[in-house]
Amino acid sequence: MKFTIVFLLLACVFAMGVATPGKPRPYSPRPTSHPRPIRVRREALAIEDHLTQAAIRPPPILPA
């Protein structure tokens, strides 16, 4: 008798688990793959600007 009740409870739990649709994945407002490339690109542009400014500026003339 106990085995039958336990088996029926397990069958009900399994049936409910199969019948419910899968939960949607939790929505993350900031996906992990998005902010990093923009930051890296921005840093690369800033470094490039700094290098071009350094290349345009003539080197200082040091006294011999």
Swiss-Prot record:
Q: What is the effect of changing P26 to D/N?
A: No significant impact on translation inhibition efficiency
Q: Does the keyword Signal apply?
A: yes
- Impact when changing P29H: No significant impact on translation inhibition efficiency
- This chain is glycosylated at S28, T32
Propeptide ranges, please?
20-21
* PTM description: Proteolytically cleaved at a pair of basic residues corresponding to the RXK/RR optimal cleavage site for furin proteases to produce two distinct antibacterial peptides.
Kindly indicate where the leader peptide sits in this chain: 1-19
Listed A to Z, the keywords are: Antibiotic, Antimicrobial, Cleavage on pair of basic residues, Glycoprotein, Immunity, Innate immunity, Secreted, Signal
Where in the body, by tissue, does this protein show up? Answer: Constitutively expressed in the calyx and oviduct of the genital tract of fertilised egg-laying females, but not virgin females. Not expressed in male genital tract. Inducibly expressed in the fat body.
* Marked site: Critical for inhibition of translation, possibly due to its role in mediating the interaction with bacterial 23S rRNA: K23, R25
What's the protein called, per UniProt?
Drosocin antimicrobial peptides
* Organism of origin: Drosophila melanogaster
